[in-house]
């Protein structure tokens, strides 16, 4: 499972997204992933330095998330391009505003409000599931805005339903999407079809793969952990 950790620790606070479509909102969290094999041993820092010359030192420090309330959603729903400027290079996400309209509206809103700026990506996994998880400014996997959004565009079928390059929302259960998301960098992920699929990486997937290849500190009980090669979102914007 890829998710956030806060939901179990805080009482839900209901808010309403006023739209043509209305939905319930609450505080959200990000709990880690489900059954994975024990991750590979993390690589030494010297290997990280040698392996990722593309990455600059990051000045991003985990901090308290902005307590943004839900945006007022207005049609039309459109596709967006969300750009993440990281210390390792630029990652562009083609956001599917047609099939995941409320999610994309929210991510567009958060990006342009500066919510993601200077936020460390807090988890990478390299066995069982293959993801880089970001979107919590605290860098701990507990943070999010003051609202959640419903699930949308859940994949159907089985097998490789989240192919490499897919971008999906982390959650702590049904309809608890907040700000945390993950980028799948390798096919054949063993993810269940319960994560809102809202975009695909069209530029910079090689950055995610390179960071993942450096391993993690294996600090997450569910698998993976903090990337050995730090990667942070220094600036995010949406068009």
Model-identified regions with their sequence ranges:
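Cyclophilin-like peptidyl-prolyl cis-trans isomerases
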Residues: 2-3, 10-16, 20, 24, ...
């Amino acid at each position: 499972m890829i998710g956030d950790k806060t939901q179990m620790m805080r009482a839900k606070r209901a808010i309403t997204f006023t739209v043509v479509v209305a939905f319930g909102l609450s505080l959200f969290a990000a709990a880690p992933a489900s059954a994975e094999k024990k991750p590979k041993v993390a690589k030494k820092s010297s290997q990280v330095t040698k392996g990722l010359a593309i990455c600059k030192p990051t000045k991003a420090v985990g901090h308290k998330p902005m307590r943004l309330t839900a945006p007022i959603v207005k049609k039309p729903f459109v596709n967006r391009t969300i750009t993440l400027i990281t210390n390792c290079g630029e990652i562009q996400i083609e956001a599917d505003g047609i099939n995941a309209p409320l999610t994309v509206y929210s991510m567009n809103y958060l990006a342009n409000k500066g919510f993601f700026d200077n936020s460390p990506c807090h988890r990478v996994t390299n066995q069982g599931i293959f993801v880089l998880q970001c979107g919590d400014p605290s860098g701990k996997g507990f943070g999010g805005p003051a609202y959640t959004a419903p699930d949308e565009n859940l994949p159907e079928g089985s097998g490789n339903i989240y192919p490499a390059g897919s971008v999906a929302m982390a959650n702590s259960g049904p309809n608890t999407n907040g700000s945390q998301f993950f980028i799948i960098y390798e096919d054949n992920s063993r993810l269940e079809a319960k994560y809102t699929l809202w975009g695909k990486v069209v530029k910079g997937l090689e950055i995610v793969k390179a960071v993942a290849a450096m391993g993690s500190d294996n600090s997450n009980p569910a698998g993976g952990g903090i990337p050995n090669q730090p990667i942070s979102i220094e600036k995010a914007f949406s068009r």
